[in-house]
UniProtKB/Swiss-Prot annotation:
Molecular function terms from GO: betaine-aldehyde dehydrogenase (NAD+) activity; choline dehydrogenase activity; flavin adenine dinucleotide binding
GO CC aspect terms: membrane
Primary gene name: betA
GO terms under biological process: glycine betaine biosynthetic process from choline
UniProt EC number: 1.1.99.1, 1.2.1.8
Recorded metabolic or biological pathway in which this protein acts: Amine and polyamine biosynthesis; betaine biosynthesis via choline pathway; betaine aldehyde from choline (cytochrome c reductase route): step 1/1
Protein name: Oxygen-dependent choline dehydrogenase
Names of required cofactors: FAD
Sequence positions that bind FAD: 6-35
Length: 560
């Protein structure tokens, strides 16, 4: 350990890995990354093998194993939340799906005063900088070709994928060649963070290549218990490792703990709602009532069907076949274990009142829940679906001064009439697609939710019972100008309002969640933050057209 550091990054997850790699490019910067979890060992099949994605969740070796407090609008159910407690964070245990979100997400980010530089034109260059997109042509102006994150375009060669895409067309939608390109709306193959049959986590892409630098130090199993201050100036951190307490000083501390851990540590440090902090015996340093508020997530369900033809991946769940599948991967990074199997899906609008897709479909040629529970069918397939920009909001609060006590949080799923209406639309749209002629040769009947779920009320009751998190918690320390009393972080600097030498860079600072998986936007924000922190000239905005419903021809950018 050094006497002091230029930057201490709390959290070696998605954003922390980007920052550790980028900030240490400047040899004059001494950088320390502190990760509470274990290392992402190269021999660890459960995180390196793409098809093993269901196993780390719920395993204390990799997962914080959070759950909500009883959700008041889901009959008091507690909803489990897997969050990566390992180097790479949730990028080491997630589904490896790469979705930027819709360009209109960023246009919305940029609408409030003070947020103008977060429009799509300013974000696109940073998306491109982080990507190497093997599924796009070199001259594609929407995609990157030289970045650390290597992206595999899903081959989607199982016949069920093509039948699903065709069913989408028969239901009145379109096919799109690249949901991260000109046109998101429609059905087609997805990009995944898989390269040469291995998971591409943020730590593998950014941190590990940089660890040979003498100015970068990465400590795992290092649990940060508090921030250290002189007045409102952060001077360093205290953390525990191997039962011993350590204190390190730094010119700047960057909090990249994620949407749960970042607001937790801020509140423990006296940064949050003053009344709540005083009730726990914590002296407030600054009153920022937005810390832990505006909490967003995506809820999803599985619509599952039995498959009449023996073409699904269902047999790969047979435990007798798993050793052979694993051996194929170990020897050649090939076979069923070399894919995350989320190789295609789509984005659609559930009604004409929304400007851009509010539903996302992940299609799988297998019927299995995220926890590994398989459907009672020899062969099956499913779609994951749910509203993507729900107006339900939750909150997170610490329960005591103890940094090791998990905070309590709730998302208030299904708490608004709009949310419930879009859930009914989501299931009806999914069922309409899955009953089309293109799927007739395979359709062996609906397994879940099943024929007993038909009315709007029955659909909502089923979602209450069966809905799961899509694992996209965000917005709990949202950025915005200081004039917005519920904002926490300055949008131009990532600095916490009213504090010195303290920044937050992770999913918590998103002003609103995007309409897809959030890992890609987090990487983009961290790339951008790295330039801001280093004082580098930002990348020039790229003003380029993108598909807008009602502006472009409805078939613009589609695949015929």
């Amino acid at each position: 350990m050094k006497e002091s550091y230029d930057y201490i990054i709390i959290g070696g997850g998605s954003a922390g890995s980007v920052l550790g790699g980028r900030l240490s490019e400047d040899v004059s910067n001494n950088v320390l990354v502190l990760e509470a979890g274990r290392s992402d060992y190269p021999w660890d099949l459960l995180i390196q093998m793409p098809a093993a994605l269901m196993y780390p969740a719920g395993n204390k070796l990799y997962d914080w194993i959070y759950e909500t407090t009883p959700e008041p609008h889901m009959d008091g159910r507690k909803v489990g939340h897997a969050r990566g407690k390992v180097l790479g964070g949730s990028s080491s245990i997630n589904g490896m799906i790469y979705q930027r979100g819709n360009p209109m997400d960023y246009e919305k980010w940029a609408k409030p005063e003070g947020m103008e530089s977060w429009d799509y034109a300013h974000c696109l260059p940073y998306f491109k900088r982080l990507e190497t997109t093997f599924g796009s042509k070199k001259g594609d102006p929407y995609r990157g070709h030289h970045g650390p994150i290597k992206l595999r375009r899903g081959p989607a060669d199982n016949p069920l994928f093509q039948a699903f895409f065709d069913a989408g067309v028969e239901a009145g939608y379109n096919k799109t060649p690249d949901v991260n390109g000109f046109r998101q709306e429609g059905f087609g193959p997805f990009d995944s963070q898989v390269h040469n049959g291995r998971r591409v986590s943020a730590s593998r892409a950014y941190l590990h290549p940089a660890m040979k630098r003498k100015n970068l130090e990465v400590q795992t199993r290092a649990f940060v218990t508090k921030l250290n201050f002189e007045g409102n100036k952060v001077t360093g951190v205290t953390f525990k490792k191997n039962g011993k307490e350590h204190t390190e000083s730094a010119k700047e501390v960057i909090l990249s703990g994620g949407a749960i851990n970042s607001p937790q540590l801020l509140q423990l440090s006296g940064i949050g709602d003053s009344e709540h902090l005083r009730s726990l015996g914590i002296e407030p340093r600054i009153h920022l009532p937005g810390v832990g508020e505006n909490f967003e997530d995506h809820l999803e369900v599985y619509v599952q069907h039995a498959c009449k033809q023996p073409v699904s991946m269902q047999p790969s769940l047979n435990k007798l076949k798993m050793p052979f599948i694993g051996l194929q991967w170990i020897l050649g990074r090939k076979g069923a274990a070399a894919s995350n199997h989320f190789e295609g899906g789509g984005f659609v609008r559930s009604n004409d009142d929304v400007d851009y897709p509010n539903l996302m479909f992940h299609f799988l040629p297998i019927a299995v829940r995220y926890d590994g529970t398989k459907a009672p069918a020899a062969h099956g397939y499913q779609v994951h679906v749910g509203p993507m920009y729900s107006n339900s909001r939750g909150h997170l609060k610490i329960k005591s001064k103890d940094p090791f006590e998990k905070p309590e949080f709730v998302f208030n799923y299904l708490s608004t009439e709009e949310d419930k209406r879009e859930w009914v639309e989501a299931i009806k749209v999914a069922r309409n697609i899955l009953k089309q002629k293109a799927l007739d040769p395979f359709n062996g009947g609906e397994i879940s939710p099943g024929p007993e779920v038909q009315t709007d009320e029955e659909i909502i009751e089923w979602v209450k019972r069966d809905g799961e998190t899509a694992l996209h918690p965000s917005c709990s320390c949202r950025m915005g100008p200081a004039s917005d009393e519920m904002s926490v972080v300055d949008p131009e600097t990532f600095k916490v309002h009213g504090m010195e030498n303290l920044r937050v860079v992770d999913a918590s600072v998103m002003p609103r969640t995007t309409n897809g998986n959030i890992h890609s936007p987090v990487l983009m924000m961290a790339e951008r933050a790295s330039d801001i922190i280093r004082g580098k000239k930002p990348l020039d905005p790229q003003y380029i057209d993108f598909y807008r419903h009602g502006v472009h021809d409805k078939d613009a950018g589609t695949v015929k």
